[in-house]
A protein has these predicted regions:
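N-terminal loops that bind phosphate or other acidic moieties
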Residues: 2-162
Length: 162
């Protein structure tokens, strides 16, 4: 995974473009995580399991010094350029403080950008898989968010089946 060139030990971002139909993907995804390696691994899993598409995904993961943590300013710096390239942006956060940082970042965005960004309550990995697949086939932000949010119920039904 690429490293932030301004800070090799700091948070990384990575992105892709749609390959499935030649059309641009309308929704990008931001992974907000306390751990850069967790976000990179989750993205790697999504890309390996859903190989027919390549969705723009950016990481807002870890702190500039390489420590665990989240930073609302970093989230904003990742969301804004992604929102410039996509019709909508879905954020997925790993844990409570990540959610708080993502909510703070939403408040820091310009209204024109904020209107096109949504924070999902979906589980991090399962939500990413659902969102990645839905975004990869060109679904809009509401549909991508619904796919991510439905991941928890799908997992719950699998677990209760045993």
């Amino acid at each position: 995974m690429p490293v932030n060139p301004a800070n090799p030990a700091g948070p990384a971002t990575t992105s892709g473009t749609a390959q499935s139909s030649g059309a641009p993907v309308s929704v990008g995804i931001v992974l907000v995580s306390h751990s850069r390696s967790l976000a990179e691994s989750a993205l790697d899993l999504a890309r390996r399991l859903i190989v027919a598409v390549d969705v723009p995904v950016e990481l807002a993961a870890g702190l500039a010094d390489g420590a665990l943590g989240t930073d609302p300013g970093l989230i904003v710096s990742v969301v804004e350029p992604l929102a410039d390239r996509c019709d909508g942006v879905l954020m997925l956060a790993d844990l409570g403080r990540g959610i708080m940082s993502a909510e703070m970042a939403l408040e820091m965005l310009e209204p024109a950008v904020d209107d096109r960004v949504r924070l999902s309550a979906a589980p991090f990995v399962e939500g990413l898989l659902g969102a990645y697949g839905a975004a990869g086939i060109g679904k809009d932000l509401a549909a991508v968010a619904a796919e991510a949010d439905g991941a928890a119920e799908a997992k719950r039904s699998q677990v209760s089946a045993f």
